[in-house]
Amino acid sequence: MAVNEFQVESNISPKQLNNQSVSLVIPRLTRDKIHNSMYYKVNLSNESLRGNTMVELLKVMIGAFGTIKGQNGHLHMMVLGGIEFKCILMKLIEIRPNFQQLNFLLNVKNENGFDSKYIIALLLVYARLQYYYLNGNNKNDDDENDLIKLFKVQLYKYSQHYFKLKSFPLQVDCFAHSYNEELCIIHIDELVDWLATQDHIWGIPLGKCQWNKIYNSDEESSSSESESNGDSEDDNDTSSES
């Protein structure tokens, strides 16, 4: 028997959802590429984060994806679907933020010129990828029902917004050696529509999902109106990213 016939993967998170490690929503080959990337090793390893916590990861997220209104481009020129994006998405999956943390980040108010639109996009992709299996059938599970309500409200809310984001084409895997696609500008409602209707994004499979059916529901519309009243200024932020 070959010595290497059975290999234990060292980068599997011990945290679980849906009776398996949270890491397994990302295919093994993609996980290996992410964990072997220089960006992950320098910025997102347990040692570099100085604590494998959401508080430490949030510092990286703000530095990587925070934008300043009135400036062209975001601070470190990261894009949706790129290597750095996938690395942070992977770390977010491994840490598995709780409901209170997700609720806070998805409803944070932009102040002093800071714009969280790339962070919002990251969290929407994370929710669709990590929590695809939620179905709401367990009426006694308040945590599950709270997550479903939060995700549906946020998807519907941003399906009605149109701010621009720099991105790899949604069907393109940045790790593929054969791609010749250039970066593009997408609107947040396009990203939401993709998450609601497609089974993959940037080369990552999206599990079959029930709570992402948002277009025929009045609940999300009424729930999101009160939350989006203070966010209408985002719709005016339609200058192209450079």
Curated annotation (Swiss-Prot):
| Segments of this protein annotated with the region Disordered | 217-242
GO terms under cellular component: nucleus; precatalytic spliceosome; spliceosomal complex; U4/U6 x U5 tri-snRNP complex
Q: Does the keyword Ribonucleoprotein apply?
A: yes
Secretion signal span? none
| Keyword list, A-Z | mRNA processing, mRNA splicing, Nucleus, Ribonucleoprotein, Spliceosome
Enumerate the InterPro entries for this protein: PRP38
Subcellular locations according to the entry: Nucleus
Q: What is its main location?
A: nucleus
Question: Per the UniProt entry, what is one GO biological process?
Answer: mRNA splicing, via spliceosome
Tell me its family.
Belongs to the PRP38 family.
Q: What does this protein do?
A: Required for pre-mRNA splicing and maintenance of stable U6 small nuclear RNA levels. Implicated in the formation of stable and biologically active snRNP structures. As part of the U4/U6.U5 tri-snRNP particle, dispensible for spliceosome assembly, but required for conformational changes, which result in U4 snRNA release and the subsequent catalytic activation of the spliceosome.
- Subunit composition? Component of the U4/U6-U5 tri-snRNP complex composed of the U4, U6 and U5 snRNAs and at least PRP3, PRP4, PRP6, PRP8, PRP18, PRP31, PRP38, SNU13, SNU23, SNU66, SNU114, SPP381, SMB1, SMD1, SMD2, SMD3, SMX2, SMX3, LSM2, LSM3, LSM4, LSM5, LSM6, LSM7, LSM8, BRR2 and DIB1.
Other remarks?
A: Present with 2380 molecules/cell in log phase SD medium.
List the protein's name. Pre-mRNA-splicing factor 38
Could you read off the lineage of the organism from its UniProt record?
Answer: Eukaryota, Fungi, Dikarya, Ascomycota, Saccharomycotina
> What is this protein's gene name?
PRP38
